[in-house]
Amino acid sequence: MSDSTAPSAHRPRGSEDFGVFDDAKTYYASDERHTGRFANRTRTYSQSSLIKQIERLNLPEPFRRGSHDESNLEQGRRFLIQVDATLESLKAQEDTDGNMQITIEDSGPKVLPLRTAASAGYHRFEVRGTYMLSNLLQELTLAKEYGRKQIILDEARLNENPVNRLSRLIKDHFWDGLTRRIDASSIEIAARDPKDWTDDPRPRIYIPSKCTAQFEYYKQVALDRPEIRLDVQLLPEVITPEIIRDMNEKPGLLAVAVEEVEEQDPVKGTIKTLRGLPFVVPGGRFNELYGWDSYMESLGLLVNDRVDLAKAMVLNFCFCIEHYGKILNATRSYYLGRSQPPFLTDMALRVYEKIKHEPDALEFLRRSILAAIKEYHSVWTGQARLDPTTGLSRYCPEGLGVPPETEPSHFVHILQPYIKKHGMEFDEFVRAYNHGEIKEPELDNYFMHDRAVRESGHDTSYRFEGVCANLATIDLNSLLFKYETDISRTIRSLFDDKLVMPEEFCQGTPYKPGDILTSALWDRKAKRRKLTMDKLMWNEEEGMFFDYDFVNKKRCTYETATTLWSLWAGLASPKQAADIVKKGLPKFEEFGGLLAGTESSRGEIGLERPNRQWDYPYGWAPQQMLAWTGLLRYSFNEEAERLAYKWLFMITKAFVDFNGVVVEKYDVTRPIDPHRVDAEYGNQGLNFKGVAKEGFGWVNASYVYGLQIVNAHMRRALGTLTPYPTFIKAIEQLNEKALADLE
């Protein structure tokens, strides 16, 4: 395995050389690369069916292995490969469980001889080990997708430093694989809803009442392409829980931001049309814009210089706030009443720092801050989510009845006693209950908390079961403190302490068009929230913040990693931060990074009390990234580096051992197969054939973001798959030797 740690360290290109680490499209679409100067030397490789059978059965060949007689080793070894035959041999020999992946769990010999390009296929060199063979499977799968029958493959793509390889895949492939835009080019697929369980599922899009240009655009698409059966609906100006409920009979995609562009029409010449602003989805099966996933993804996009995508997602968020009143859980009709953890101010400020040299940068930031102000008032401190006694906020989305996006059978065990009580069939009861014809306060309470859990982004966890809407959570109130301080600082430093409220962002706020906002107002809000949280949520003895139950007027005891969000937001005092690091952090730190919650808080599990995915023993990318950033904010650099190293090591090890896998969440207590998750939703990102195309959005981001946290020595150690205890022991020995040399 190469020990280089940066793309610049890869071998240089010669005059006849191509980019060894080019993206797959560039690498496999080039005829010259794969047929050029070797084209007249490949006849030796055209083997009889007998030799192909020998390859397939892995029998000894009458040829010697020309392992070290390459004529161009200084340029790097290359293999001359017949794609289909080699792929067939590789799968037959190495993919012993038949899942189109080569992992440490396959029992093949883990060695495959390949013909060398320098010998025109006469000599061979053995490719060995799970990592190289799984990379070979991935490369051959890609080559086949690009229509190649024969390729010249650089060995460097097979033994590439895994940190470099995963970083490269994220930058060159995964982000593109997860990028969507909603317009005529994608509407047929994007507007189909896998959760449409009605009798007539069809593509459907809802347009905000004020977006007449989009409405006309999609109506024309429907007229031009009747075969796709696109249903275009205009939303009412005011959207109530009753309207959201009734829309469940016709679920659909919600329109997002577009831009006007010019394109060439073969008949009309240059015409103006609409094009959707792009956004990144969490995983490959999604086609809608998501809430806090988008913020987490933006952290990685900015590292990879994809400012265009991060900026477009901010603009999409502003569009959602202006037209739907909130940043939605996701842009589907059944999510119109539900938001997700708010990160808009930090996201916009990070993008602004990258584009502030551009002429429209300040206007971009102005609209983003105004949208955040509207969201702050109309959503998070609005009547539904604000506890007036404490002044703290909770997750509590609007909604009536049974959440429609779940499988119809999901709530059978909850509803069965009520169905029996009323002597009704399942569907009959759900319809009557949803429309208020049956009153069941206990059931209302259950679904209020269920919707709140989904809005929290932490669905599901025993932390929230049956109580979520009663809680002022440490995570939400830390985020709102960050909104307050971000808005205050931005108004003061960039808008001369005067920000004028325009009409489009006044709805749901206490402001009128033309009102001038100053930083002092937002400073007071932040100070008041900080004082209240210190009083109600801080536990001096435990050295942590806890959720506060304002119904029962008591502090909760569930230990959650979101206590570290107080560092990310700058809410914790220096002493509180030190206490959290000293007393709290050790409770969450595991082999692979931070746990979402502690084992003692989760409690015993069994058949009647199964695992929940946001509890022990699982770790999630958002918790890691916010913790690293928060620790660095308070100068706990060593702790941030250690946690980042553990998370990155776990991801890299699974990537190497399990055919390039990158998944939604990990069991941070499992050293061998942390991507295996035994929780209610399983794990996304596992079921690919041959090669992973997208990874998972916020894990991709955490990887490239985390590599900015660790130092160069750590990055080199990650490339050689050095576990953290081994790494830190070696560092300590080096330090001891250095001290001894000084004496």
Swiss-Prot record:
GO terms for molecular function: alpha,alpha-trehalase activity; calcium ion binding; trehalase activity. Optimum temperature is 55 degrees Celsius at pH 7.0. It is an enzyme of class 3 (hydrolase). Pfam families: Trehalase, Trehalase_Ca-bi. It is found in: Cytoplasm. Keywords: Calcium, Cytoplasm, Glycosidase, Hydrolase, Metal-binding. GO terms for biological process: ascospore formation; trehalose catabolic process. Pathway: Carbohydrate degradation. Its cofactor is Ca(2+). Optimum pH is 7.0 at 55 degrees Celsius. The active site is at residues 459, 664. Substrate binds at residues 285, 292-293, 329, 338-340, 405, 454, 457. The keyword Membrane does not apply. It catalyses: alpha,alpha-trehalose + H2O = alpha-D-glucose + beta-D-glucose. Its EC number is 3.2.1.28. One of its GO terms (cellular component) is alpha,alpha-trehalose-phosphate synthase complex (UDP-forming). The keyword Hydrolase applies. Ca(2+) binds at residues 95, 97, 99, 101, 106. Belongs to the glycosyl hydrolase 37 family. Hydrolyzes intracellular trehalose to glucose. This is Cytosolic neutral trehalase. It comes from Beauveria bassiana (strain ARSEF 2860). The gene is NTH1.
